[in-house]
């Protein structure tokens, strides 16, 4: 009988649920009592761990056969108790007795997770962004403004000149503030120089505003009217945004042509910028040739990142164009609404003048005044729709075209490398034929050509790796700037919408007593 009451050997049996629960309760009670009996012990965590290890490794069968879940539960409780250090006192002091609640140990773990996720990552990300901006040279103390458009000359020889004002504390410039006069062709010439230097090596060069033959012809030969003034203002704002994006680029800012454009009082006349000149026609032919080459050259893309980004920019280009068309339609509808509101205000005023009833006549006159104010609000909102939102979309449609152009130059670089490899293979085949034909005079020439093309292959590989590395960096910088620009513009645009609606409410609330006063 005594042998039957002996515990089974280690691992040969399992305790009953009642025995397991009872031992588990004793185990946890011992832990709590240990904490309460020695609150001022120098190392409560180690003391508790020793207590638990003694109980769990003893000869008791129930403690040996504890399941994994219960051991993990106690381990978490032990881990939480070990956090009771001087650094964690403010967190644990807010709760009355966190260690006395063994049934819900997750309540002890949750504050620790929340405190980490709420404070550390935010501070780390912000400081990391600041460090990256400083390291990449994205923060520059330079302000660019384009103002004072002025018509110079008469007839078809006339052109618009703009004042470019620069304020900076950078040591590369001779003065802290200076301004120069530039015509539109000077901006196009600057972009052409920068693109020829940096586009083929992987740098994203912000595109200059496009020429408008119709708009500029109206400015040259026509009288000053609202359409001409609007065209000049659009171009001025576009030129200002172009320069601001250009000087934000750390590499382009160091370029001597850009510094000359900003500082020099006189610039050599920019040539080959006319749309209908020989150079303009040549550019159109080159674009057509590039389009054909793009269709014929198929690069076996081995980098998934480039393949993904190309698809991403294709989709963004399509969606931006759709949104831009929608915003332009919205601007047209707002202008139409403004015109109809003005017509309504005029009709209401005329009806009020012909009305014999005094109160009704006064109310109609007040209604006409309110509608005139609302007409002005619609004009201002259409202005905000265009200059805040539509122009941003238009800029980024051209910027994404520049990004896609950089990807095309990478394909050209790969094609050049591939052609060099094919030529090298042919040269080696020629050498083998010469050796078989036993022509020693031509063998040496073939070897020299092989060495030459081996160097070209190595150079092509280096160029391809370098442009790929540069594009990765440039795309990261571009996407960061894109998010910043869209965030800033969307906030300003929403603020303008809210302000417009609030002003509308004020106008109608002020008119409501007049309408109620009609008797």
Swiss-Prot record:
<feature type="binding site">
    <location>
        <position position="185"/>
    </location>
    <ligand>
        <name>a 1,2-diacyl-sn-glycero-3-phospho-(1D-myo-inositol-3-phosphate)</name>
    </ligand>
</feature>
<comment type="subunit">
    <text>Predominantly forms heterodimers with BAR domain-containing sorting nexins SNX5, SNX6 and SNX32; can self-associate to form homodimers. The heterodimers are proposed to self-assemble into helical arrays on the membrane to stabilize and expand local membrane curvature underlying endosomal tubule formation.</text>
</comment>
<feature type="modified residue" description="Phosphoserine">
    <location>
        <position position="185"/>
    </location>
</feature>
<feature type="modified residue" description="N6-acetyllysine">
    <location>
        <position position="469"/>
    </location>
</feature>
<dbReference type="InterPro" id="IPR001683">
    <property type="entry name" value="PX_dom"/>
</dbReference>
<dbReference type="GO" id="GO:0042147">
    <property type="term" value="P:retrograde transport, endosome to Golgi"/>
</dbReference>
<feature type="modified residue" description="Phosphothreonine">
    <location>
        <position position="101"/>
    </location>
</feature>
<feature type="compositionally biased region" description="Low complexity">
    <location>
        <begin position="30"/>
        <end position="44"/>
    </location>
</feature>
<dbReference type="GO" id="GO:0035091">
    <property type="term" value="F:phosphatidylinositol binding"/>
</dbReference>
<dbReference type="GO" id="GO:0005768">
    <property type="term" value="C:endosome"/>
</dbReference>
<dbReference type="InterPro" id="IPR037918">
    <property type="entry name" value="SNX2_PX"/>
</dbReference>
<feature type="binding site">
    <location>
        <position position="183"/>
    </location>
    <ligand>
        <name>a 1,2-diacyl-sn-glycero-3-phospho-(1D-myo-inositol-3-phosphate)</name>
    </ligand>
</feature>
<feature type="region of interest" description="Disordered">
    <location>
        <begin position="1"/>
        <end position="20"/>
    </location>
</feature>
<feature type="modified residue" description="Phosphothreonine">
    <location>
        <position position="104"/>
    </location>
</feature>
<feature type="region of interest" description="Disordered">
    <location>
        <begin position="30"/>
        <end position="103"/>
    </location>
</feature>
<keyword id="KW-0446">Lipid-binding</keyword>
<keyword id="KW-0653">Protein transport</keyword>
<dbReference type="InterPro" id="IPR015404">
    <property type="entry name" value="Vps5_C"/>
</dbReference>
<feature type="region of interest" description="Membrane-binding amphipathic helix">
    <location>
        <begin position="278"/>
        <end position="295"/>
    </location>
</feature>
<dbReference type="InterPro" id="IPR005329">
    <property type="entry name" value="Sorting_nexin_N"/>
</dbReference>
<feature type="binding site">
    <location>
        <position position="235"/>
    </location>
    <ligand>
        <name>a 1,2-diacyl-sn-glycero-3-phospho-(1D-myo-inositol-3-phosphate)</name>
    </ligand>
</feature>
<feature type="modified residue" description="Phosphoserine">
    <location>
        <position position="119"/>
    </location>
</feature>
<dbReference type="GO" id="GO:0031901">
    <property type="term" value="C:early endosome membrane"/>
</dbReference>
<comment type="function">
    <text>Involved in several stages of intracellular trafficking. Interacts with membranes containing phosphatidylinositol 3-phosphate (PtdIns(3P)) or phosphatidylinositol 3,5-bisphosphate (PtdIns(3,5)P2). Acts in part as component of the retromer membrane-deforming SNX-BAR subcomplex. The SNX-BAR retromer mediates retrograde transport of cargo proteins from endosomes to the trans-Golgi network (TGN) and is involved in endosome-to-plasma membrane transport for cargo protein recycling.</text>
</comment>
<dbReference type="GO" id="GO:0034498">
    <property type="term" value="P:early endosome to Golgi transport"/>
</dbReference>
<feature type="compositionally biased region" description="Low complexity">
    <location>
        <begin position="93"/>
        <end position="103"/>
    </location>
</feature>
<dbReference type="GO" id="GO:0005829">
    <property type="term" value="C:cytosol"/>
</dbReference>
<dbReference type="GO" id="GO:0006886">
    <property type="term" value="P:intracellular protein transport"/>
</dbReference>
<dbReference type="GO" id="GO:0030904">
    <property type="term" value="C:retromer complex"/>
</dbReference>
<dbReference type="Pfam" id="PF03700">
    <property type="entry name" value="Sorting_nexin"/>
</dbReference>
<dbReference type="InterPro" id="IPR036871">
    <property type="entry name" value="PX_dom_sf"/>
</dbReference>
<keyword id="KW-0967">Endosome</keyword>
<keyword id="KW-0597">Phosphoprotein</keyword>
<feature type="modified residue" description="Phosphoserine">
    <location>
        <position position="97"/>
    </location>
</feature>
<dbReference type="Pfam" id="PF00787">
    <property type="entry name" value="PX"/>
</dbReference>
<feature type="region of interest" description="Interaction with RhoG">
    <location>
        <begin position="260"/>
        <end position="519"/>
    </location>
</feature>
<comment type="similarity">
    <text>Belongs to the sorting nexin family.</text>
</comment>
<feature type="domain" description="BAR">
    <location>
        <begin position="299"/>
        <end position="519"/>
    </location>
</feature>
<dbReference type="GO" id="GO:0030027">
    <property type="term" value="C:lamellipodium"/>
</dbReference>
<dbReference type="GO" id="GO:0072673">
    <property type="term" value="P:lamellipodium morphogenesis"/>
</dbReference>
<keyword id="KW-0966">Cell projection</keyword>
<feature type="modified residue" description="Phosphoserine">
    <location>
        <position position="117"/>
    </location>
</feature>
């Amino acid at each position: 009988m005594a042998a039957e009451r002996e515990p089974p050997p280690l691992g040969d049996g399992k305790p009953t649920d009642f025995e397991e629960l009872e031992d588990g309760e004793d185990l946890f009670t011992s832990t709590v009592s240990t904490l309460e009996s020695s609150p001022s012990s120098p190392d409560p965590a180690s003391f508790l761990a020793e207590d638990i290890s003694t109980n769990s490794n003893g000869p008791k069968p129930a403690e040996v056969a504890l399941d994994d879940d219960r051991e993990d539960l106690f381990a978490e409780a032990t881990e939480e108790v070990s956090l009771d250090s001087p650094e964690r006192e403010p967190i644990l002091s807010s709760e009355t007795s966190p260690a006395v609640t063994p049934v819900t140990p997750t309540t002890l773990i949750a504050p620790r997770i929340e405190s980490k996720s709420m404070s550390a990552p935010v501070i780390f990300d912000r400081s990391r962004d600041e460090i990256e901006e400083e390291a990449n040279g994205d923060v520059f103390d330079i302000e660019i403004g384009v103002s004072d458009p002025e018509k110079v000359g008469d007839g078809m020889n006339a052109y618009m000149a703009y004042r470019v004002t620069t304020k900076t504390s950078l040591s590369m410039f001779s003065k802290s503030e200076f301004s120069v006069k530039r015509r539109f062709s000077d901006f196009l010439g600057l972009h052409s120089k920068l693109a020829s230097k940096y586009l083929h090596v992987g740098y994203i060069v912000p595109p200059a505003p496009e020429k408008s033959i119709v708009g500029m012809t109206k400015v040259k030969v026509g009288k000053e009217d609202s359409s001409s003034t609007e065209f000049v203002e659009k171009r001025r704002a576009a030129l200002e945004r172009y320069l601001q994006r250009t000087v934000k680029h750390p590499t382009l800012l160091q370029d001597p042509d850009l510094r000359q454009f900003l500082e020099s009082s006189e610039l050599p006349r920019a040539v080959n910028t006319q749309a209908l000149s020989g150079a303009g026609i040549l550019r159109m032919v080159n674009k057509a040739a590039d389009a054909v080459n793009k269709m014929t050259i198929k690069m076996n893309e081995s980098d998934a990142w480039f393949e993904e980004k190309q698809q991403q920019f294709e989709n963004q280009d399509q969606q931006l164009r759709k949104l831009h068309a929608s915003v332009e339609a919205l601007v047209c509808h707002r202008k139409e609404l403004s015109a109809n509101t003005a017509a309504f205000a005029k009709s209401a005023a005329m009806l009020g003048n012909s009305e014999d009833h005094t109160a009704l006549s006064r109310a109609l006159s007040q209604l006409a005044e309110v509608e005139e104010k609302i007409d002005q609000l619609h004009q201002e909102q259409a202005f905000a729709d265009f200059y805040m939102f539509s122009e941003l979309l238009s800029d980024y449609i051209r910027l994404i075209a520049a990004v896609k152009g950089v990807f095309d130059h990478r394909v050209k670089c790969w094609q050049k490398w591939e052609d060099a490899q094919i030529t090298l293979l042919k040269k080696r085949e020629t050498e083998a034929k010469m050796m078989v034909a036993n022509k020693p005079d031509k063998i040496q020439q073939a070897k020299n050509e092989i060495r030459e093309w081996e160097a070209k292959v190595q150079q092509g590989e280096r160029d391809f790796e370098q442009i790929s590395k540069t594009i990765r960096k440039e795309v990261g910088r571009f996407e960061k700037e894109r998010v910043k620009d869209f965030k800033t513009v969307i906030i300003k645009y929403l603020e303008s919408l809210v302000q417009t609606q609030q002003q509308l409410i004020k106008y109608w609330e002020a008119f409501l007593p007049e309408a109620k006063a009609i008797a």
